[in-house]
From Swiss-Prot:
One of its GO terms (biological process) is proteolysis. It comes from Oryctolagus cuniculus (Rabbit). It is found in: Secreted. Belongs to the peptidase A1 family. This is Pepsin II-1. Its EC number is 3.4.23.1. Disulfide bonds join 106-111, 267-271, 310-343. Its main location: secreted. The active site is at residues 93, 276. It holds the Pfam family A1_Propeptide. Residues 16-59 form a propeptide.
Amino acid sequence: MKWLLLLGLLALSECIVHKVPLVRKKSLRKNLIEKGLLQDYLKTHTPNLATKYFPKETFASVSTESLENYLDAEYFGTISIGTPPQEFTVIFDTGSSNLWVPSTYCSSLACFLHKRFNPDDSSTFQATSETLSITYGTGSMTGILGYDTVKVGNIEDTNQIFGLSKTEPGITFLVAPFDGILGLAYPSISASDATPVFDNMWNEGLVSEDLFSVYLSSNGEKGSMVMFGGIDSSYYTGSLNWVPVSHEGYWQITMDSITINGETIACADSCQAVVDTGTSLLAGPTSAISKIQSYIGASKNLLGENIISCSAIDSLPDIVFTINNVQYPLPASAYILKEDDDCLSGFDGMNLDTSYGELWILGDVFIRQYFTVFDRANNQVGLAAAA
C-alpha cells in the first residue's frame, strides 16, 4: 500500500502545472485616451503589426519589433529578477522571444516612471558585454544583456539571460501599464540569440513537459492564467484539437478559411496565422479586414478606432475560422469589444505578404474564446473551447 501511495505521489509530482496569474488592466491606448494624448501619439507613432512579424522580410534589422503594437495589450503578469527579487509587470508574449525590463542604466523618462532593475542590488547578477537593440517607431530600445535568477510563478531559473534597457525614447512607455516583455516564441527569432525563458526552463529541467498553455478570461480583471509544463483541463470544455506548427519561429499555423454564414470571405485557398498572446486584436490583410468591417457595419471614428453600434451585436453573425478541418466560430460578443459607452470592432488591418503568403494574427480576441496550448515537444498548437 505504501508503495502504491509513493508511486501515486511521484506521478503527481511529474505532471505539476506551474500557474502564473494574469491581470487584465487598462491598455496603453485607454490610458492615452483618458489623458487626452492619443491623437498626438498617433501622429508620430503609427501602430503597424507588420513590423512585429518576419522583420527580415520587411526591414533591414533582424531585431526590429514595433513596440507601438502593444498599444492594446491588456493581460499582464508579475515576475521577479535577482537576489533578493525585484518585481516587474510584463506581457507574456508568444509573438516574440526576448525577456527585457527597464534598468537603472536607463535615464529615459519612461524608465523613471516604471520599475527599474538595479544590478547592484542583486548578488546573483552577471554582466556581459553583449548588447540588445529593439527598434520601434522613431527610436529604439537599447540595452545590455545579463544573467540572473528569474522567478516566474514558483519556477526559479537561476541562469536566465535577459535585457536591461539603457534607452527608451519617445512616449510609448510613459503611460504603459507594463514594465517589460517576456517572449515565449521560438529561439530562432530571439534578438542577439538570447535563450528564451521557456527554453531555459525546459533545458534546466524546471518543467515536466515541454509545453505551456494560456487561458484568457473574458470577465473582469482576474482569472486569466499562463501555465508552464502542463495542461489544466478545468480551463476548457470538450477535447483539444491539435494543429501542426507550419514554421518554427512564431507560433505559426495554417488556416483553411474564414467564413460568414457559409460564405468564404477571406483565406479562400488557405493562409498562414500566428497565435499571439501579445496582440490584443485579430489582424489580417487590410483588404480582407475592410470587407469584414463593412459586413459587420464598423466605421472609423476620429481616433481611428472601428466603431459599431452596440445595439447591433445581437444580430451579427458568427465569423468562423476553419483550422486543420475544425471550425472555430467567433460570436459577435467575442469580436465586438465594449469600451464604456462604445463598441469597437476586434479586427485590425495590416499588410504583410511573407514567403509563406498572407498572414493573419490570432490575438487575444481569439484566445479568449479558445484555450490554447503551445506544445514545443511536438511543434503543435492545441485549441479547445474555453470554459
